[in-house]
UniProtKB/Swiss-Prot annotation:
Subcellular location: Cytoplasm
Pfam annotation, one family: CSD
Coiled-coil zones: none
Name this polypeptide is given: Major cold shock protein
Amino acid sequence: EKGFGFITQDNGGADVFVHFRAIASEGFKTLAEGQKVSFEVEQGQK
């Protein structure tokens, strides 16, 4: 809904902020709560 959210890491690390522009997929970019994803953490401006 908001265009952003947080990913909870399996290893218990801090939640990771994710913006819809960072999702690598075709068409409507969305993630569902509880969906398993793979990701790489990058430092942003904030």
